[in-house]
Swiss-Prot record:
The gene is adk. Residues 122-159 are annotated as: LID. It comes from Aeromonas hydrophila subsp. hydrophila (strain ATCC 7966 / DSM 30187 / BCRC 13018 / CCUG 14551 / JCM 1027 / KCTC 2358 / NCIMB 9240 / NCTC 8049). Monomer. Pfam families: ADK (PF00406), ADK_lid (PF05191). GO terms for biological process: AMP salvage. This is Adenylate kinase.
Amino acid sequence: MRIVLLGAPGAGKGTQAQFIMEKHGIPQISTGDMLRAAIKAGTELGLKAKAVMDAGQLVSDDIIIGLVKERIAQPDCANGFLLDGFPRTIPQAQAMKDAGVAVDFVLEFDVPDEEIVKRMSGRRVHSGSGRTYHVVFNPPKVEGKDDVTGEDLVIRADDEETTVRKRLDVYHQQTAPLIGFYGKEAEAGNTRYVKIDGTQPVDLVSKQLATILG
C-alpha cells in the first residue's frame, strides 16, 4: 500500500499518518529524514546532497527521487510506505512516475484556509515542558497560563497568523496543482484519489480512512 498525503500545513495529516502507520505497519517517509540518513551513511547520493547543501543550494529533484527509490527498496517498505511532504510539485510527481514509483492512494486532506489559520494561530505552548493548548479547542484553566506551573504560555513563531498565511500561500502555489495531476492519474486508473473533509473530528477521519484503505 503506497500512499501520498496531500494537504496544507495544519490540515491534520500528521495525526492521520500516525494512525495509518500503526494500522497497516508501513513506514512514513520524510525527505528530511532520508537526506539526513543518506548524508550520515555517506552514500553516493548522500555525498552529492551534502555538497549541494553545503553550498547553500536546494537539493535537486533527481537526488531526492534517487533517495526515495533507495529508501522504498528497503525491507520495511515491502508492504508499502507513506509519503508526506513529497512530492510537492508537478515536476517531482512526474519524475517519481517516470522513475517507476507507483502510488496506490492519494489522500487529500481538505480544510479551508480560515479554519487552518484558526487552528494554528490559536495554539499556545508552555516553553519549559512543551505542553500545548488551544484557545478554542483545548484552553488552559487560566487564560494564557500553563495548567501545571502557572507560567506564561507563548505563541510559537510558526503559529503566528502572518507566518501561517505565508505557508498557505506557498502551498497553494506549489502543491495545490498536484491535486489536478493526481486527479488525472486517477481517471487513467493509475491511482485512487480520495478527498477527505479534514474539518471532521479526528476519530471520524480515522474511521473514514480505515474504510477507504481496508
